[in-house]
Curated annotation (Swiss-Prot):
Active site location: C381 (nucleophile), H507, E509
Binding site for ATP: S14, I15, G16, K17, G18, I19, D71
EC numbers for this chain: 6.3.4.2
NCBIfam families the UniProt entry points to: PRK05380.1, PyrG
Residue span(s) of domain Glutamine amidotransferase type-1: 292-534
Protein name: CTP synthase
Gene3D superfamilies: 3.40.50.880, P-loop containing nucleotide triphosphate hydrolases
Gene: pyrG
GO biological process, one term: 'de novo' CTP biosynthetic process
Pathway connected to this protein: Pyrimidine metabolism; CTP biosynthesis via de novo pathway; CTP from UDP: step 2/2
Function, in words: Catalyzes the ATP-dependent amination of UTP to CTP with either L-glutamine or ammonia as the source of nitrogen. Regulates intracellular CTP levels through interactions with the four ribonucleotide triphosphates.
Originating organism: Prochlorococcus marinus (strain MIT 9215)
Length: 536
């Protein structure tokens, strides 16, 4: 039977609950326990799939095609465990399920209320993850901040949850902030005391406090928090600001987070094996020469919009003992100026996914610059589509080529709508989503990098390469490195006579892990290092 850990946050938003949950997952897994982590998000959207990246950041896609919160990416990267659509729950999806049940008559004519029906549905979702994953420990992160109106149903649900199981099957962790007041030179505990008081008023007594701070917390402060918040002093965990999110598990291990959690769950504190993780942090803190990577996008004002891409680059740099020097380049600024102005000093160029016309011509200019100047290049999803358009216009004698998404009237739609998407009206959850197989072509860079005949990658798109133009592309020097097993869909392309020029229709960034970098990102960094060595 599974045990359950609930992670709440107080005082301020963006306190780091997701990293705490993911770090605890890593620590538990290092002790031999299986873990699954789910996120309860208190917004009314059914999922983040239709939300602006400026509002929500990246949409993380799971193996089974769910469009989820970016925290699920942290969960997967830290625990190296695949999550599913069950691991992402929103207020919108809960209300939708309850209303659908009411319409079907599932409540036998009863009055449908927040308590017990909404809270009951939330508890059911948590139990469903336990049943589906069969994990030893289920960690649940509750989005928002204690005191927010929209979080109340979730907090009530996790309060009720302890009645579904034995008390020693549940642990409550509250992540909070201890602000340092510069004028007085003091760390203040009062905001945390009030946050815990608010949590207690709902009926939840936290078992552990994880205290975020940029200053070290002495024993006196821990004793004070223990007394005012009713938490064992050993369960007051210091969480100092870290140099990297990947160093957080080691810091929390030192503070005893995992040991104390296991104590409340009455589970054995097994021997912890973090040798590989420690080696990872050593390489991270002792990098070699920097690699200047330009990320050319349309949402660069919010770095979280490309979170998995950045982490995948970081994983590859750690593996190759390089330092990541990331240059955020606005595709729209390239349109107003020139690609050379923004890209002449970089060692590699990445064009990530996206939607819509804005910034596309800037991306195409960046790709042309990478191709002509022999700069290692990787295109992802829309990045591949832009690479196809660039080649068609500048090499394959199709100057008016475009995508039917960007220009429905183009006479040469080298990128067109997938046939199964033609009658789709709704936006949410209707794209080609989730894992699909890709057969790699022999004697290609792609095949060499993966060293597999068939790979499985995650997708999120409606448009694809138009096979009507396949032969003209092949004749003009393009290589198709990977297709769907039936050969119908082009998934990976590359150029010969270039240090590294690959573009894929899928999202390889979702499968990159610390210590297990994705082959396409690893290949990009390696090619950049080799080019730098040759130029020196």
């Amino acid at each position: 039977m599974s045990k359950f850990v609930f992670v709440t946050g107080g005082v301020v938003s963006s306190i780091g609950k997701g990293i705490v949950a993911a770090s605890l997952g890593r620590l538990l897994k290092s002790r031999g326990y299986s873990v699954s982590i789910l996120k309860l998000d208190p917004y009314l959207n059914v999922d983040p799939g239709t939300m602006s990246p400026f509002q929500h950041g990246e949409v993380f896609v799971t193996e089974d095609g769910a469009e989820t919160d970016l925290d699920l990416g942290h969960y997967e990267r830290f625990t190296d465990t695949a999550m599913t659509r069950l691991n992402s729950v929103t207020t919108g999806s809960i209300y939708q399920a309850v209303i659908n049940k009411e319409r079907r008559g599932s409540y036998n004519g009863g009055t449908v209320q927040v308590i017990p029906h909404i809270t009951g549905e939330i508890r059911e979702r948590i139990h469903r993850v336990a049943a589906n994953s069969n994990a030893d420990i289920i960690i649940t992160e509750i989005g928002g901040t204690v005191g927010d109106i929209e979080s109340l149903p979730f907090l009530e649900a996790i309060r009720e949850f302890k009645n579904d199981v034995n008390r020693n099957d549940v642990a409550y962790i509250h992540v909070t902030l201890l602000p340092f007041i510069k004028t007085s030179g003091e760390i203040k505990t009062k905001p945390t005391q009030h946050s815990v008081k608010e949590l207690r008023s709902i009926g939840i007594q936290p078992d552990l406090l994880v205290c975020r701070s940029d200053k070290s917390i002495n024993e006196g402060l821990k004793k004070k928090l223990s007394g005012f918040c009713g938490v064992n002093i050993k369960s007051v965990i210091e969480a100092l600001d870290a140099d990297s999110i990947y160093s957080v598990p080691l810091a929390l291990k030192k503070e005893g987070l995992c040991k104390e959690t296991l104590k409340y769950l009455e589970l054995e504190d097994k021997e912890c094996d973090l040798k590989n993780w420690e080696a990872l942090i050593h390489n991270l803190r002792n990098p070699g020469d920097p690699i200047k990577v330009a990320l050319v996008g349309k949402y660069i004002e919010l770095g979280d919009a490309y979170l998995s891409v950045v982490e995948a680059l970081r994983h590859a740099c750690i593996e190759k003992k390089a330092s990541l020097d990331l240059h955020w380049v606005s595709a729209e600024m390239i349109e107003k100026g020139s690609a050379e102005t923004y890209l002449k000093e970089v060692d590699a160029i990445v064009v990530p996914g996206g939607f819509g016309n804005r910034g596309v011509n800037g991306k195409i200019s960046a790709i042309k610059f990478a191709r002509e100047k022999k700069i290692p290049f990787l295109g992802l999803c829309l990045g591949m589509q832009c690479a196809v358009i660039e080649w068609a216009r500048n090499v394959a004698n199709l100057p008016d080529a475009s995508s039917s998404e960007l220009n429905p009237d183009t006479p040469n739609p080298v990128i067109h709508l997938l046939p199964e998407q033609e009658d789709v009206v709704d936006l949410g959850g209707t794209m080609r989503l989730g894992v699909y197989p890709c057969r790699l072509t022999n004697n290609t860079t792609g095949k060499k990098l993966y060293d597999e005949d068939v790979i499985y990658e995650r997708h999120r798109h409606r448009y694809e390469f138009n096979n009507y133009y396949k032969q003209s592309f092949l004749n003009s020097g393009y290589k198709i490195s990977g297709t769907s097993p039936d050969g119908r869909l082009v998934e990976l392309i590359e150029l010969e006579n270039h240090p590294y020029f690959l573009a894929c229709q899928y999202h390889p960034e979702f499968l990159s892990r610390p210590g297990k970098p994705h082959p396409l990102f690893q290949g990009l960094i390696k090619a950049s290092q080799e080019k730098l060595t040759q130029s020196n």
